[in-house]
UniProtKB/Swiss-Prot annotation:
Residue ranges annotated as propeptide in the record: 1-2
Subunit-structure text: Heterohexadecamer of 8 large chains and 8 small chains; disulfide-linked. The disulfide link is formed within the large subunit homodimers.
Sequence similarity: Belongs to the RuBisCO large chain family. Type I subfamily.
Residues forming the catalytic site: K175, H294
CC cofactor: Mg(2+)
Positions of modified residues (N6,N6,N6-trimethyllysine): K14
Any single GO BP term: reductive pentose-phosphate cycle
Entry protein name: Ribulose bisphosphate carboxylase large chain
Organism: Glycine max (Soybean)
Length: 475
């Protein structure tokens, strides 16, 4: 190295390791409308100051690395770096903090949830300075939202396609989830749809197994849909699961569904991946298919309360990537979901504008700038006695999905569907008449059961079934 080169290097670059907080902790920073904002729950290792931990998150999820590098001088770090601009302790928790991080929009590829998550929830989650890290919420700026198509159709377009208004939609997951032949599977679909349900559903792990190949299932389910439509005069659907081992195979299944003339297909968006999901959502919009989304694997990511990612973030990501329905818990069934927290991300799925509300776990005001909404699906351990609570909690713009609560009826599948439809119609009518579903729910169901033997039988079977456990979420 020449003396001249040595002089320039010594002036422009100083090698070594320095604290992240010297560069990435900027409490005076004023956030921009175009920034992506993140709220992380940070648990530092013993001896690591919270400022250093928050700055480390900002650095490792944006432009930083473990040591100073000379190529930092070839760009403007001030323009591209993430910034930890706020810290607050978590009430009731020892050594946990909410770290607020702002990311410049130029860090992210347009229209790519995959790229956004690769940065924000990538390698930083394995960082040694942190005992645990959880992404609680994201604020997606309107400038970035406008680069996404979002849901293929949205709530209003779906209602218009189905010609169904003023009530939640009713669904049922076909059980047993694995093992039925395609013909017997189609028979169960037909019986449920004929009995009064709007939709039936493939279970999330039904793809194309030796006992039932996908093409056979699609054909028998299409026959069931058209037969039940002819008999009831209502538009029906079955969520045909197009999830597959490759994107090419997934698209082939979606194309076949469109050729059959069915109204809706399905995708497991977390196991299938956001790239595949966005591709399928684009195809569904272009070809008039509704898209039902299942969240299989979500609890691996969101169940631990100090590490991972809250489902509200996955819900926002799904609205960007695309889906007309997504499973969102029940509050009252067998799967975990605290009421206020669940309603917080349900509103984030459906509404155009949601105000910051920490009591519901919403850390940032979110403006969706007319991106279509997503119907939340309540599913998991629910039955007719839950109908008043579900109708009150989720309102009209939702799908209430009863699997065992339909197919477990003592008289069979069609009577199980009748019982659910009668219970729903009774609850909607009572609500419209001004009755209090929370207080009078059981009475409303009993009154309706006097005129419906199917509902009376269902009420008797499930009168003692409850799923009561302590909620785990903390704000």
């Amino acid at each position: 190295m020449s003396p001249q080169t040595e002089t320039k290097a010594s002036v422009g670059f100083k090698a070594g390791v320095k604290d992240y907080k010297l560069t990435y902790y900027t409490p005076d920073y004023e956030t921009k409308d175009t920034d992506i904002l993140a709220a992380f729950r940070v648990t530092p290792q013993p001896g690591v100051p919270p400022e250093e931990a928050g700055a480390a998150v900002a650095a490792e999820s944006s432009t930083g690395t473990w040591t100073t590098v000379w190529t930092d001088g070839l760009t403007s770090l001030d323009r591209y770096k993430g910034r930890c601009y706020g810290l607050e302790p978590v009430a009731g928790e020892e050594n946990q903090y909410i770290a607020y991080v702002a990311y410049p929009l130029d860090l992210f590829e347009e229209g790519s949830v995959t790229n956004m998550f690769t940065s924000i929830v990538g390698n930083v989650f394995g960082f040694k300075a942190l005992r645990a890290l959880r992404l609680e919420d994201l604020r997606i700026p309107t400038a970035y939202i406008k680069t996404f198509q979002g849901p293929p159709h949205g709530i209003q377009v779906e209602r218009d396609k189905l010609n169904k208004y003023g009530r939640p939609l009713l669904g049922c997951t076909i059980k047993p989830k694995l093992g039925l032949s395609a013909k017997n599977y189609g028979r169960a679909v037909y019986e449920c749809l004929r009995g009064g349900l709007d939709f039936t559903k493939d279970d999330e792990n039904v793809n194309s197994q030796p006992f039932m190949r996908w093409r056979d299932r699609f054909l028998f389910c299409a026959e069931a849909i058209f037969k039940s439509q002819a008999e009831t005069g209502e538009i029906k659907g079955h969520y045909l699961n197009a999830t597959a081992g490759t994107c090419e195979e997934m698209m082939k299944r979606a194309v076949f569904a469109r050729e059959l003339g069915v109204p809706i297909v399905m995708h497991d968006y977390l196991t299938g991946g956001f790239t595949a999901n966005t591709s399928l959502a684009h195809y569904c919009r272009d070809n008039g298919l509704l898209l039902h989304i299942h969240r299989a694997m979500h609890a691996v990511i969101d169940r631990q309360k100090n590490h991972g990612m809250h489902f509200r973030v996955l819900a926002k990501a799904l609205r960007l990537s695309g889906g007309d329905h997504v499973h969102a818990g029940t509050v009252v069934g067998k799967l975990e979901g605290e009421r206020e927290i669940t309603l917080g991300f349900v509103d984030l799925l459906r509404d155009d504008f949601v105000e910051k509300d920490r009591s519901r776990g919403i850390y940032f005001t979110q403006d969706w700038v007319s991106l279509p909404g997503v119907l939340p699906v309540a599913s998991g351990g629910i039955h007719v006695w839950h109908m008043p609570a579900l109708t009150e909690i989720f309102g009209d713009d939702s799908v209430l999905q009863f699997g065992g609560g339909t197919l477990g009826h003592p008289w069979g599948n069609a009577p199980g569907a009748v019982a659910n439809r009668v219970a729903l119609e009774a609850c909607v009518q009572a609500r419209n008449e001004g009755r209090d579903l929370a207080r009078e729910g059981n009475e409303i169901i009993r009154e309706a059961s006097k005129w419906s033997p199917e509902l009376a039988a269902a009420c008797e079977v499930w009168k003692e079934i409850k799923f009561e456990f302590e909620a785990m979420d903390t704000l």
